[in-house]
């Protein structure tokens, strides 16, 4: 069985006096795709932000058996965790290529340019737009850039927050196909927050259902996607 790469235990997260996550616990195993599902307001984005050191938390977050609960966001990136936020989060005034270079801020090796070329090979449209500002790209192109920029840090774990949000179905399909390739061919472990339950579970190994800041269901993705009661009750089916 694969090793546990990321583990959250009794994790709470708050914005000021408002507690959003109420002691949740979950695991992500090495080389798997795990998804967190739930309706708007369930706490999905807060979960990803908590793992990235962006909100106040209690409980324990371990990555490769090391406690990262109190680390700042940039230190978490240096440990091997990259975050693609909801809404793309590119630097709109920078060019496509400069955005990619920003993604490699923790690196000092000689492979950065090769990795930029790999991003262009994965998404040829980014090569075509490499001298344009990120703000001039379409929504789908910005999402491709956001994912590529995160990969420039060579993460072991990629956190993706609502990657399908606001995108045309054909763009979403292409993105998720690329996620599968990244996982199967390159061994990138992923934790994906999604509202599109059928799409996410269709590519995942493991799923968690979040409701009102608590994990109410967890299990193999295949079992969740085939459980009509779960789909109806929690996933909008």
Show where each model-derived region lies.
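Glycine-rich phosphate-binding loops of nucleotide-dependent enzymes
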Residues: 2-237
């Amino acid at each position: 069985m694969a090793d546990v790469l990321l583990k959250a235990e009794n994790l709470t997260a708050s914005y000021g006096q408002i507690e959003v996550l109420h002691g949740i616990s979950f695991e992500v195993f090495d080389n798997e795709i795990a998804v967190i599902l739930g309706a708007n307001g369930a706490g999905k984005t807060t979960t990803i932000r908590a793992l990235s050191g962006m909100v106040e938390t209690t409980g324990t977050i371990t990555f490769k058996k090391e406690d990262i609960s109190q680390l700042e966001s940039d230190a978490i990136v240096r440990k091997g965790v990259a975050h693609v936020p909801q809404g793309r989060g590119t630097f709109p005034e920078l060019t496509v290529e400069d955005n990619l270079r920003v993604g490699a801020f923790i690196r000092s090796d000689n492979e950065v340019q090769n990795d930029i070329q790999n991003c262009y090979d994965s998404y040829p449209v980014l090569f075509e737009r490499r001298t344009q500002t990120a703000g001039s790209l379409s929504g789908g192109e910005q999402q491709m850039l956001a994912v590529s920029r995160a990969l420039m840090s060579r993460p072991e774990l990629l956190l993706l927050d609502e990657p399908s949000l606001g995108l045309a179905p054909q763009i979403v399909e292409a993105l998720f196909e690329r996620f599968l390739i990244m996982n199967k061919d390159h061994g990138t472990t992923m934790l994906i927050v999604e509202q599109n339950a059928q799409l996410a579970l269709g590519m995942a190994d493991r799923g968690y259902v979040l409701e009102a800041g608590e994990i109410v269901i967890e299990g193999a993705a295949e079992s969740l996607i085939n459980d009509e009661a779960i789909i109806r009750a929690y996933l909008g089916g």
